[in-house]
From Swiss-Prot:
Region of interest (Involved in Mg(2+) ion dislocation from EF-Tu), ranges: 79-82
InterPro entries on file: EF-Ts_dimer_sf (IPR036402), Transl_elong_EFTs/EF1B (IPR001816), Transl_elong_EFTs/EF1B_dimer (IPR014039), Transl_elong_Ts_CS (IPR018101), UBA-like_sf (IPR009060)
Protein name: Elongation factor Ts
GO molecular function: translation elongation factor activity
Described purpose of this protein according to its UniProt entry: Associates with the EF-Tu.GDP complex and induces the exchange of GDP to GTP. It remains bound to the aminoacyl-tRNA.EF-Tu.GTP complex up to the GTP hydrolysis stage on the ribosome.
Chain's gene name: tsf
Similarity remark: Belongs to the EF-Ts family.
Record keywords, A-Z: Cytoplasm, Elongation factor, Protein biosynthesis
Any one of the GO CC terms: cytoplasm
Main location: cytoplasm
SUPFAM superfamilies in the record: Elongation factor Ts (EF-Ts), dimerisation domain, UBA-like
Length: 307
């Protein structure tokens, strides 16, 4: 089959492998991008541990919190220029506050009343499209709550209070000092923003992702020519390393790399004054998994000139 240059370029961006290696990988896998990533990894050509999600939408992540809960929303716009617009920022801030009063489900947030308008959030977004003159949408929303303790928030690349390009929530359940729990939770939220863990615990890692890694590790280990019992131990070691990289509580704490998050929490309990547990986290990065339509500027100009 014919492999397009665009597909080769996309595989290179994901894996960092050479052009000919990418072309061969795509030819061997029938043009399947994800299978080509695995093919390169099995050959030891790609050093990518996981495929990075492409961030291609503009807009803002908005966070809002009260004593025992917090919410994250993503509102997309077509351009970054609009994301810097005061009216758009107010829209996102208000939607986050509305979401805090719901269960966090995006449909519930869209249907909820927008403050001071007598309209729904969905209607308020439509009004903003007409006023600002650019398409926009409430893409997603999520909420974390605790019965006792705190839900900490952190915004990376903040453009205004509670608004930015990456937003993180971390829930800490404890009978101890809620403010101390919130302070530690904020540090963990900063860590999550930086490391983007896949799951809170080993048990929560997608079994399909684990199976995929085991298959890749096994193929890599067999290329060493070592006996099967040694290969099993090699795979176990690599899988342990995989968990340390992608599971939040197993990760080295970016603020103090000598401690894992698990151990840092034990240390924080001294300040909190009671046992504490991280019960959940949410990380929203703007435009995660959404691809912007690319355009050829020269072709656009040529087309416009012919009109």
């Amino acid at each position: 089959m014919s492999i397009s240059a665009a597909l080769v370029k996309q595989l290179r961006e994901v894996t960092g492998a050479g052009m000919m290696d990418c072309k061969t990988a795509l030819a061997e896998t029938g043009g399947d991008l994800e299978a080509a990533v695995d093919w390169l990894r099995k050959k030891g050509i790609s050093k990518a541990d996981k495929k990075a999600g492409r961030t291609a939408a503009e807009g803002l992540i908005g966070l809002a919190a009260d004593a025992t809960s917090a919410v994250a929303v993503e509102v997309n716009s077509e351009t970054d220029f609009v994301a810097r617009n005061d009216a758009f920022q107010e829209l996102v801030r208000n939607i986050a506050q509305v979401a805090l009063g719901t269960d966090g489900n995006v449909e519930a947030v869209s249907a909820a009343s927008y403050p001071g308008s007598g309209k729904s959030v969905a209607d308020a977004v439509r009004d903003a499209i007409a006023t600002i003159g650019e398409n926009m949408a409430l893409r997603r929303s999520a909420k974390l709550s605790v019965s006792k303790g705190a839900v900490a928030t952190y915004v990376h690349n903040s453009v205004s209070e509670g608004l930015g390009k990456i937003g993180v929530l971390v829930a800490i359940e404890t009978e101890g000092n809620a403010e101390a729990a919130r302070n530690f939770g904020r540090q963990v939220a900063m860590h999550v923003a930086a490391t983007n863990p896949l799951a809170l615990s080993e048990a929560e890692v997608d079994p399909a992702a684990v199976a995929r890694e085991k298959e890749i590790f096994s193929d890599q280990a067999r290329q060493s020519g070592k006996p099967e019992n040694i290969i099993e131990k090699m795979v176990e070691g690599r899988l342990r390393k995989f968990y340390e990289e992608v599971v939040l509580v197993k990760q080295a704490f970016v603020i103090n790399p000598d401690l894992t998050i698990e151990k840092a929490l034990k240390e924080a309990e001294k300040e909190i004054g009671a046992p504490a547990k991280i019960t959940g986290f949410i990380r929203f990065a703007l435009g995660e998994g959404v691809e912007r339509e690319s355009s050829d500027f020269a072709a656009e100009v040529a087309a416009a000139a012919k009109k």
